[in-house]
Amino acid sequence: GSGVSNGGTEMIQLSHIRERQRYWAQDNLRRRFLEK
């Protein structure tokens, strides 16, 4: 994470990143399906 961070904020940031990646993956699949 960022320079000033403890374990708690690191875990929170990691979970946010995973949620964002999951959202983008689903969005990409949806777009690919709609384009066909």
Curated annotation (Swiss-Prot):
The keyword Chloroplast does not apply. Keywords: Amidation, Hormone, Neuropeptide. One of its GO terms (biological process) is neuropeptide signaling pathway. GO terms for molecular function: hormone activity. The keyword rRNA-binding does not apply. The modification Lysine amide is found at residue 36. Supra, subesophageal ganglia and segmental ganglia of the ventral nerve cord and brain. May be involved in leech reproduction. This is Egg-laying-like hormone. It comes from Theromyzon tessulatum (Duck leech).
